[in-house]
């Protein structure tokens, strides 16, 4: 479905992504983990063309693109199949929940208003917010705002959704409602690439984990193998730090990791 090869991205003289290779199959839920500053968000932004890569190729549904020389028309064709959920919601403050969900459908996709409204209400219902269709962002909690953002992504019928730390801006008491929606999407077969520090989500919902450090992917494993059989010392240290702060009990294997580091 999605394959990236030799992705490079620099800001000035600082190389942020150092020749990344990755693949995502239909139905995959891929957790992108790693310490702050490892390039996780930049990776997502390059995949959705919010940043321009210096080099690399993308194969999306059999169509091959050179990421350095990709055209606006090609970008548009890929974006029609993708959606992006930002960590800070990025909602229009002066528009209702439904208007936020349908804005892109009407303006960018040129859908008839009636069809856009139907899609918008269906998407809001999927995230449990159909009753809040006429509420403005300031009338919603942070968790509800992020669910509106997810509904906006769903309304475009994407093949894959990119999530950039979707719970990092939320009060801890609101994180669960967003993760619950994401878990439901995973169960329904939605393909997702998720930058997150929510270890329980990565362990229990994702089927694949990518671990990044200093602009490189240093490990790609199934979620089970990543959490139960970490091999590199830096990954063991990372898990020890974040699992001690994550909610829920740890398995025997995860406790063993903490003891070994």
Show which residues each predicted segment covers.
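Conserved ABC ATPase signature
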Residues: 136-140, 144
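Helix-to-loop junction immediately C-terminal to a conserved catalytic motif
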Residues: 48
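Conserved ABC transporter NBD signature motif
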Residues: 56-66
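ABC ATPase NBD coupling module
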Residues: 65-83, 113-114, 229-230
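A short, proline-enriched helix->beta-strand linker immediately N-terminal to the Walker B motif
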Residues: 155-159
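Catalytic Walker B motif of ABC-type/P-loop ATPase nucleotide-binding domains
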Residues: 161-164
């Amino acid at each position: 479905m999605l394959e990236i090869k030799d992705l490079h991205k620099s800001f000035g003289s600082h190389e942020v992504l150092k020749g990344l290779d990755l693949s995502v199959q239909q139905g995959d839920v891929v957790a992108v983990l790693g310490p702050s500053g490892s390039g996780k968000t930049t990776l997502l932004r390059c995949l959705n063309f919010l940043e321009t890569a210096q080099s690399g190729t993308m194969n999306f549904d059999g169509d091959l693109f050179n990421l350095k020389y990709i055209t606006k028309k090609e970008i548009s064709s890929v974006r029609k199949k993708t959606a992006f959920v930002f960590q800070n919601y990025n909602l229009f403050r002066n528009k209702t929940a439904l208007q936020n969900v349908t804005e892109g459908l009407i303006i960018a996709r040129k859908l008839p208003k009636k069809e856009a409204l139907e899609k918008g209400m269906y998407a809001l219902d999927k995230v449990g917010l159909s009753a809040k269709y006429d509420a403005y962002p300031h009338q919603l909690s942070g968790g509800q705002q992020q669910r509106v953002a997810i509904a906006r992504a769903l309304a475009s019928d994407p093949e894959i959704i990119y999530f950039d730390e979707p719970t990092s801006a939320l009060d801890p008491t609101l994180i669960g409602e967003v993760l619950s929606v994401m878990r439901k999407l995973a169960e329904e077969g939605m393909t997702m690439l998720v930058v997150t520090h929510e270890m329980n989500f990565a362990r229990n919902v994702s089927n694949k984990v990518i671990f990044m450090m200093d602009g490189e992917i240093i490990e790609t494993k199934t979620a089970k193998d990543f959490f139960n059989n970490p091999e590199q010392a830096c990954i063991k240290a990372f898990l020890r730090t974040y699992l001690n702060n994550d909610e829920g009990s740890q398995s025997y294997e995860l406790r063993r990791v903490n003891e070994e580091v």
